[in-house]
């Protein structure tokens, strides 16, 4: 927790924190509780990367009344143009069905390229790309 507090004190302008490759970590209430509490105290949201089906982050975030979102899918789990495009199409379907959908991706050049192409066509598909904080607040209220 000391490391988290130190890192959080060094940056400005971010809206929240997220787990990364912490599947075992996010399923343990006693481990996650102080992290969620510290983030909530600072007015931050939490993005669960969706890697752990038994993650306790959602319930802990709800208990703190903090903004929260869970990634619906990893867009570049298979980092090829075809698979990224397929994942983005699935993300669109989820967004149309539920009103919002959250995808995560790494900063691979192919991921950035495919997301940029996809984002340009969203309006013609009846979808609006919004900041993650919008999805977090929608999740918190709904």
Task: Say what each PLM segment does.
Residues 2-88, 100-101, 106-127, 133:
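Catalytic domains of cell-wall/extracellular-matrix polysaccharide-remodeling enzymes
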């Amino acid at each position: 927790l000391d490391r988290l507090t130190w890192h959080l004190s060094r940056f400005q302008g971010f809206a929240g924190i997220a787990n990364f490759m912490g599947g075992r970590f996010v399923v343990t209430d006693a481990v996650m509780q102080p992290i969620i509490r510290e983030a909530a105290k600072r007015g931050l949201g939490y993005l669960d990367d969706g890697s752990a089906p038994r993650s306790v982050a959602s319930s802990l975030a709800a208990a703190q009344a903090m903004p929260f979102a869970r990634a619906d899918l990893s867009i570049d789990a298979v980092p090829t143009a075809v698979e990224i495009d397929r994942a983005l199409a699935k993300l669109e379907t989820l967004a149309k069905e539920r009103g919002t959908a959250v995808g995560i991706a790494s900063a691979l050049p192919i991921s950035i390229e495919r997301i940029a192409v996809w984002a340009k066509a969203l309006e013609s598909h009846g979808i609006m790309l919004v900041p993650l904080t919008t999805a977090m607040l929608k999740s918190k209220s709904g």
